[in-house]
């Protein structure tokens, strides 16, 4: 029987000083001996996905205390990728994932907490907390802030029909010379109407959905709107459940509630299967690889490639399809509706554990909104957007009269009526990316699934943006942005502005983009990222010359620099001959802080999840 970790600092004569300090935090004499639950919040006023989390930690804490445990809240950092986008701030986004994981490890281990509640929401916060959960392997539950409502705009002087929109529309239209200043202003004012993570299937929402598929959060966690009053119950239930599973582990020796018992190889395959089926962000691949690495699970790019070939796309939302947003996914039954359709097609391992049901199979049955007997599930997934601008959580209680149960033409479809039999994400291999690169196929037009073009080479995102806005890119070009990987950036910037500007210039279906950097979950089009190994690690993307021909064949999962092996070897030898200047960008003027240099010194390429490898600096 495992012993409560907290006894280290709460029991024994020699811990009198520690107990004195615990008392100063509000712990009473009768509390000693109760489990101590750490509540890792990520509230910040910088990020709309986190601005409403101010009181969430205490909401969970009070429920924990009612259930018979001690709750202690602390905070982590949270970076808004959208605000950090397009300037040097984006260098800090991915490295913050590791800082978040480290900070949680430090706080939980320093204070000997017995269990953990992770209150996350946006892009790097959820994966950072997942990494911490795997590292600590104590009872853990995730509850996120929820997605924002989709924006709406009527159009200038009510001439245009009403349309829904999001952050990406503001970025694209701001660079489109055919869109007036007034139209841009209207889009800007309406794109992000409420608190919550951005309204499409971008990175934040993708990751929060994946915590459901992994079995570490409650049903609805990824799709229940931040503004809806019903979401409050997720936080309250998380507070009660963490105490329950904590006692099951420490008092009943039930290891099935531990993160590493839940997030097994089968669970990672389930999560990736669901991700492919819903056309999630390519960043999810990066993060799942990193989380699996921390969990000690042998889950690699080859596994993702294998799954991508057999899983169809059965849910297609913004940015890949502007008919549907997260609020529509929720109305259709949420993530468990997607999981049900995948299970019917034999695509899942349903014998895995979850924190809220004995097995995934049990959970799918319990949360099936097509079963009229599941009244709790039906009530939860009728939650609708309020349509009122607000930064307040739980501020409206509007409900849909009916659910979207149309599995032929609705938001979530059965496998027979899939949006495409090819999944929403794919891994490509070839001489330019020997360890793979990633594309969100759900966002690629069918006309360019096979594409051959001439390389336009840029040594930084800034140079590429300047080239695109300066009309240097024409139809048939493949924009190469290199030395933007985890090590080369350092920090692996998102390339949302280059892809958005290509659309602004009318080149969204006429060009491709290849980078060793990554993309926002809001990216669509023939945008291929995570080229591994990256240029700074000796990857062949660093050997591409201006005007080279590159062939892309998504159905065959291939990408090829059209030169001979001998020519490629000669270019590599020429690069190596540059000595200390080899595998470094030319003429790039970029300030890199000591913190970023430290990250870059340990960072691995994207095919390994961009995790830190301390052995690279050990002597």
Curated annotation (Swiss-Prot):
Cofactor note: Binds 1 [2Fe-2S] cluster per subunit. This cluster acts as a Lewis acid cofactor.
Reaction equation(s) it catalyzes: (2R)-2,3-dihydroxy-3-methylbutanoate = 3-methyl-2-oxobutanoate + H2O; (2R,3R)-2,3-dihydroxy-3-methylpentanoate = (S)-3-methyl-2-oxopentanoate + H2O
GO biological process assignments: isoleucine biosynthetic process; L-valine biosynthetic process
SUPFAM superfamilies given in the database record: IlvD/EDD N-terminal domain-like, LeuD/IlvD-like
GO cellular component, one term: cytosol
InterPro entries: Dihydro-acid_dehy_C, DihydroxyA_deHydtase, DiOHA_6PGluconate_deHydtase_CS, ILV_EDD_C, ILV_EDD_N, IlvD/EDD_N
Any GO molecular function: magnesium ion binding
Keyword terms of this UniProt record: 2Fe-2S, Amino-acid biosynthesis, Branched-chain amino acid biosynthesis, Iron, Iron-sulfur, Lyase, Magnesium, Metal-binding
Cofactor requirements of the protein: [2Fe-2S] cluster; Mg(2+)
Annotated binding of Mg(2+), by residue: 81, 123-124, 494
Active-site residues, as the UniProt record annotates them: 520
Residues where N6-carboxylysine is found: 124
Superkingdom of this protein's organism: Bacteria
UniProt: [2Fe-2S] cluster binding residues: 122, 198
UniProt EC number: 4.2.1.9
EC category name: lyase
Pathway listed: Amino-acid biosynthesis; L-isoleucine biosynthesis; L-isoleucine from 2-oxobutanoate: step 3/4; Amino-acid biosynthesis; L-valine biosynthesis; L-valine from pyruvate: step 3/4
Entry's family note: Belongs to the IlvD/Edd family.
Reported function: Functions in the biosynthesis of branched-chain amino acids. Catalyzes the dehydration of (2R,3R)-2,3-dihydroxy-3-methylpentanoate (2,3-dihydroxy-3-methylvalerate) into 2-oxo-3-methylpentanoate (2-oxo-3-methylvalerate) and of (2R)-2,3-dihydroxy-3-methylbutanoate (2,3-dihydroxyisovalerate) into 2-oxo-3-methylbutanoate (2-oxoisovalerate), the penultimate precursor to L-isoleucine and L-valine, respectively.
Subunit and interaction comment: Homodimer.
Protein name (record): Dihydroxy-acid dehydratase
Source species: Neisseria gonorrhoeae (strain ATCC 700825 / FA 1090)
Lineage: Bacteria, Pseudomonadati, Pseudomonadota, Betaproteobacteria, Neisseriales
Primary gene name: ilvD
């Amino acid at each position: 029987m495992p012993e409560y970790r907290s006894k280290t600092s709460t029991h024994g004569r020699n811990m009198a000083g520690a107990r004195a300090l615990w008392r100063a935090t509000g712990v009473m004499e009768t509390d000693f001996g109760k489990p101590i639950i750490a509540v890792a919040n990520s509230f910040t006023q910088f990020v709309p996905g986190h601005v409403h989390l101010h009181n969430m930690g205490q909401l969970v804490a009070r429920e924990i205390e009612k259930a018979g445990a001690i709750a202690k809240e602390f905070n982590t950092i949270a970076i808004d990728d959208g605000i950090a986008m397009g300037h040097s701030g984006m260098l800090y986004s991915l490295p913050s994932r590791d800082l978040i994981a480290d900070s949680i490890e430090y706080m939980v281990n320093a204070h000997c907490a017995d269990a953990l509640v992770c209150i996350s929401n946006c892009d790097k916060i959820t994966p950072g907390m997942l990494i911490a959960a795997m590292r600590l392997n104590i009872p853990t539950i995730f509850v996120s802030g929820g997605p924002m409502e989709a924006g709406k705009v009527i159009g200038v002087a009510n001439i245009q029909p009403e349309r829904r929109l999001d952050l990406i529309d503001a970025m694209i239209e701001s660079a489109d010379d055919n869109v007036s200043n007034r139209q841009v202003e209207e889009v800007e004012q309406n794109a992000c109407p409420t608190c919550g993570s951005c309204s499409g299937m971008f990175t934040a929402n993708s990751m929060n959905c994946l915590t459901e598929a992994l079995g570490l959060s409650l049903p609805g966690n990824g799709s229940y709107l931040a503004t809806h009053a019903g979401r409050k119950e997720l936080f309250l239930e998380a507070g009660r459940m963490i105490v329950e599973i904590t006692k099951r582990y420490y008092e009943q020796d039930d290891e099935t509630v531990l993160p590493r018992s839940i997030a097994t190889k089968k669970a990672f395959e389930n999560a990736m299967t669901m991700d492919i089926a819903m056309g999630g962000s390519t960043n999810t691949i990066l993060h799942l690889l990193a989380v699996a690495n921390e969990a000690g699970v042998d889950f690699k790019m080859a596994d993702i490639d294998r799954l991508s070939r057999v899983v169809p796309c059965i849910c297609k939302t913004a940015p890949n399809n502007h008919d549907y947003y997260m609020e529509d996914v929720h109305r259709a039954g949420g993530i468990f509706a997607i999981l049900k359709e995948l299970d019917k097609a034999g695509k899942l391992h349903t014998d895995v554990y979850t924190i809220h049901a004995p097995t995934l199979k049990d959970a799918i049955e319990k949360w099936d909104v097509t079963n009229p007997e599941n009244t709790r599930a039906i009530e939860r997934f009728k939650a609708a957007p309020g349509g009122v601008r607000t930064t307040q959580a739980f501020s409206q209680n509007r409900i849909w009269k009916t659910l979207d149960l149309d599995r032929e033409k609705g938001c979530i479809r059965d496998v027979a009526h899939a949006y495409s039999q090819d999944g929403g994400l794919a891994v490509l291999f070839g001489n330019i990316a020997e360890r793979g690169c990633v594309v969100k196929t759900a966002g690629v037009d069918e006309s360019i699934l096979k594409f051959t073009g001439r390389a336009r080479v840029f040594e930084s995102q800034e140079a590429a943006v300047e080239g695109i806005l300066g009309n240097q890119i024409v139809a048939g070009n493949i924009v190469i942005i290199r030395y933007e990987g985890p090590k080369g950036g350092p920090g692996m910037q998102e390339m949302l502005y280059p892809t958005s500007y290509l659309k602004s210039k009318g080149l969204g279906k006429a060009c491709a983009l290849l980078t060793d950097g990554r993309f926002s979950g809001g990216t669509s089009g023939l945008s291929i990222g995570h080229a591994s190994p990256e240029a700074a690690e000796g990857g062949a993307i660093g050997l591409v010359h201006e005007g080279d021909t590159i062939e892309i064949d998504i159905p065959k999962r291939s990408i090829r620099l059209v030169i001979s092996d001998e020519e490629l070897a000669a270019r590599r030898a020429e690069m190596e001959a540059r000595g200390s200047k080899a595998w470094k960008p030319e003429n790039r003027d970029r300030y890199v802080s000591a913190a970023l240099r430290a990250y870059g010194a340990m960072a691995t390429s994207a095919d390994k999840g961009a995790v830190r490898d301390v052995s690279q600096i050990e002597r």
